Amino acid sequence: MARIAHIANLYGPKSGGLKTAMNSIAQEYTNLGHDVMLIVPGERDLVTKKPFGTVVEIKAPIIPFSGGYRIIFNTNKVKEELKKFAPNFLEISDRTTLLRLADWAKTESIDTAFYAHERVDKVVAAFLPFLPFKKSLIDYANQKIANKVDHIIATTEYAATEFRQLSSSNDLNLDSKLAISPLGVDLIHFSPKNSNSELKVKIANKQKILLACTRFSKEKDPDFLLDIAHACKINGTQIQLVIAGSGPLTKKLVARAEKEDLPVSFIGFISDKNYLAQLLASADLFLAVGPIETFGLAALEALASGTPVICRDTSAITEIIDSKCGYSLPRDSSRWAEQIRNHFDLDQVAISKFARGRAEEFSWEESARKLLSRFKIDQGSFQEKF
């Protein structure tokens, strides 16, 4: 049995994919007999026992204008908790304050893995398009990560690209450290069986339901959802766009939808997992407009629910869908509206089955087993370290 610790910032009540991935992988590690601890930021210091392991919250301030996300600055407290837990392996889902714990782990002969949850080059381009020497700065930051950790885990080829480019441009060989390990999906909880006819009528009357689950921040490009709704209105496609999520752009988006009288409903962040499962299964199409998604867990949950997906052709979701269960398109609202209209002329039952079948190729158990194999963690392979 191994003791595996996973540390992360930006993990909280509204974290979405990161929180789901960490909790789900931890649960599979636990099912396989390992001890797991998650260390994350919180409103106060708190230790909670969960079915998937121990969650240690370290008191941390809220990042201004982030919509409630927190970041841990007291890394000594994190180190204290790690010493008490005595991990055999340390997983890191952070490029900022917590990355320095990789140095501590190295002094303790603890192997480490860094998870590339985002394309930092794309995030910087979205928020700081005119920043000088962007590529050099990003390469420097990524090189520091590569030097600090034993493994770099990307969920898709798209997520791995900036590290592959770093290896190529600097004549480095990161292949021994870099691995592709897709995420999974809860195929029991997310199912076409959750489709709810009463819910369909309640949220869209007799209109087709377009569903989007996203964070309302610049890098997710939520404004494009309203462009699509406007284009559907112009071409006469009778739809109701239901948007689940929250973030710093909420007021701006709501104001625009009201001003333009768009067929859009904002339902906020969905914390009820059962309600989310019903929404995903009741929707006719799932719209994933984020241009720089490195996996797209919500899109995979939609497929598991039997709901086809339209995504941006620049994101990693193109690696998740195929032509039988989804479409990838550029940022052109008229083309999205046309595809939406044409989609409803197709065999919806067959497409739903293809969507579910594609999702069944992904599982959390397989994700966890692949990671453990990569990390060379087997049953009974570790002794007490401290």
Describe the function of each predicted region:
Residues K202-H230:
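Conserved donor-binding/catalytic core segment of Leloir-type glycosyltransferases
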Residues F269, A277-A283:
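Short alpha-helical donor nucleotide-sugar binding micro-motif in glycosyltransferases
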Residues D111, K122-K144, S168, S191:
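Nucleotide-sugar donor phosphate/pyrophosphate-binding loop at the beta->alpha transition
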Residues P291:
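Aromatic "clamp/platform" in nucleotide-sugar-dependent glycosyltransferases that forms part
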Residues K251-I270:
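Nucleotide-activated donor-binding/catalytic signature segment of Leloir-type glycosyltransferases, i.e.
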Residues S323-S334, R341-D347:
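Conserved acidic donor-binding segment of nucleotide-sugar-dependent glycosyltransferases
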Residues P308-C311:
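Short hydrophobic beta-strand element within catalytic cores of glycosyltransferases
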Residues D139, N147-K177, V185-H189:
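A short, active-site helix/loop in glycosyltransferases that binds the activated sugar's phosphate group
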